[in-house]
Amino acid sequence: MSVEKKPFGTLSDGREVSLYTITNEGGESISVTDYGASVTSILVHDRDGNLRDIALGCDNAADYECQTACLGGVPGRVANRIEKGEFTLDGTVYHLECNDGPNHLHGGSHGFHRRLWQASIASENSVRFTLFSPNGEDGYPGNVVVSVQYTWNFTKKGYFNDRDKSVLDIWYKGMSDRDTPLNLTNHTYFNLNGHDSGSVGGHLLKIVSDEFTENDANCLPTGRIVRLDEPEAKVMDFRTSKEIGRDWNEKNIHLQNGSGYDHNYVLLEEATYAAKAWTPESGILMVCTTEQPGLQLYAGNFLENSNIRGKGGV
């Protein structure tokens, strides 16, 4: 196990950005940067023993600063949308930036994924990022300190087979001196055939869930929890593995309201994992576990028109 730190370029204001690469005993690695506490690459072996980078990202800090897709970052203070950029807490109405049409998204245009975090090497296989957000920043109350730690392990015990596997553990911590909303996540885009391999429509996906949260036309939750055995929910059903792209062109109100798949699935409490994805091309299997009650399925619906310069110019 080892952690390597190297320069990752500079931001427009001249601040230097660093890249941290953790390599495990299986020769597989993950790279993370202090800009946005972002995952920039995940290198794992395919069925033929070749390394593939399965995380979308950019080559340097300048390209990350220009992109608006939250590639690999930690959005905050609140991931996802807040209607009309307003919320009420303890009788006070707070007004936030509306950076997604009429709504607030991922903490606004200065969200945590667009901030330079303080980094430290926590161990031989983990890196920790810490960020301070003062009271009133972007309209939110409370002085907040958040930490995110990435730990990269290797084990010979698999979930579904006896193959060796790498394990990425993401740990979050937030502290505030006042009540405030805080909802952190990681926004990595995965392609198990490789970041430069195009569509994930052929990936097989299973989600351990019987219900999902309904969206309105602005991709905001309506408050209705839809069961997957309802007739109009068939296209949303991943209880049995199916290709992600099998139904995504169907004329269905749920897909229209999300501009594709961009929905929260309510996870079964007794499940040992939340979701698994696999692609026959590479043979790479990804399993997701969580302590949280929901999982967001997002199929990169807005990437095509985002003008992002990805790794290697992709």
Q: Model segments located where?
A:
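An exposed, glycine/acidic-rich loop-and-rim segment of catalytic or binding clefts
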Residues: 1-314
